[in-house]
């Protein structure tokens, strides 16, 4: 099945960024807005990607 690229709910700070029609989210407490996306894994936690497109390509 297709895994969605999502933000981890417990780390979130939103910045004014929008890539490919999707909102980017950012890790709290990292200083500035370094974007990341996660691709959830059932058994291994999550893979992290710096752009929505990279995440999308890996998840689908």
Curated annotation (Swiss-Prot):
Domain BPTI/Kunitz inhibitor positions: 5-59
Keywords on record: Disulfide bond, Protease inhibitor, Serine protease inhibitor
Covalent S-S links between cysteines: 5-59, 15-39, 33-55
Alphabetical list of InterPro entries matching this protein: Kunitz_BPTI_sf
Superkingdom: Eukaryota
Additional remarks: The inhibition of factor Xa seems to be reversible and stoichiometric.
GO function terms (MF aspect): serine-type endopeptidase inhibitor activity
Record function comment: TAP is a slow, tight-binding inhibitor of blood coagulation, specific for factor Xa.
The protein's name in its UniProt record: Tick anticoagulant peptide
